[in-house]
Amino acid sequence: MSPFSTPRVPVSLLILASLLVGSLHAAPEVIRDIEYSRPGGYSLTLDLYLPENPKGATAPTVVWVHGGGWKNGSKDKCKAAWLADEGYAVASINFRLTHVAQWPAQIDDCREAVRWLRRNAGVFGLDADNIGAWGSSSGGHMVALMGTLPYEENESISSRIKAVCDWYGPTELLTMPPNNVGNGRTEEDVANSNGAKLLGCTVKDCPELAKQASAYDQVSPDDSAFLIMHGDQDPGVPLQQSLQLHNRLQKAGVPSQMKVLVGAGHGGKEFETKESRELIRNFFDRYLKRS
């Protein structure tokens, strides 16, 4: 067994758990540590939050991608879990962090999670036609790319999503302050930045790769709908990163909403107020729920 392995959840137990959710429980339930992929023997898992829906109904699904600078964090703290109370299934995923693999492993994992959800939609009562994504910080960076990167034409199962909620994610790696010398940052600082660890090089040394990993540089008219939320006091990711993505999406004719949270920093309580949740719910309802 690989040293990276985690116990595989047998399919029979997954099916049983799914049936139990539908028949015994009156509230959203979570099935944890489901393996969705094993690239190079490295086990990738997700937690699946299932809503209480009428018998025979399928649930629109939102993939939650955690933050942590691509090097930290896990699926265990799922900011999107409350959507299960609103009729959504939520898949909170782990992906390969930068000490395990460099770009594009991270986006490959996100897309494979979507394919897994579609392959297993019938088992868990998911609506395979209505899948969105939501992430914060580096997770916001990745869900924005899930909604903008070109899709593989030869995909046997599509990784396409319909809607993206991007919380304060970097959208243009070339202009992110930690990736550039200046304002007290040295060449050594930049070489050790999260962006350099993600790409395996500095943005100065590999600008084309940085563009491939930047939603701002990947916008096209057929992109997913976007809701972008960012604090105007964010010390980590400049507000301009979100504003410029929003503007480019709109110029391309892509539906995009921009919500600037006054006084908010890099995350915080402002993103989880009743008003913020209502904005997010209404956004996903518009693009993922069947009329």
What are these language model-derived features?
Residues L173, Q233-V237:
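Acidic catalytic loop of the alpha/beta-hydrolase fold
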Residues E112-G182:
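Primarily recognizes the serine-hydrolase "nucleophile elbow" in alpha/beta-hydrolase
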Residues S74-S92:
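Short amphipathic alpha-helix adjacent to the substrate-entry channel of hydrolases
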Residues A57-G67:
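Short beta-strand element of the alpha/beta-hydrolase
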Residues A264-T273:
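Catalytic histidine-centered segment of alpha/beta-hydrolase-like enzymes
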Residues P39, P177-Q218, K251:
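Mobile cap/lid helix-loop segments that gate and shape the active-site cleft of serine hydrolases
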Residues A26-A57:
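N-terminal cap/lid segment of alpha/beta-hydrolase-fold proteins
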Residues D222, I228-H230, D234:
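Short beta-strand/loop motif that positions the catalytic acidic residue
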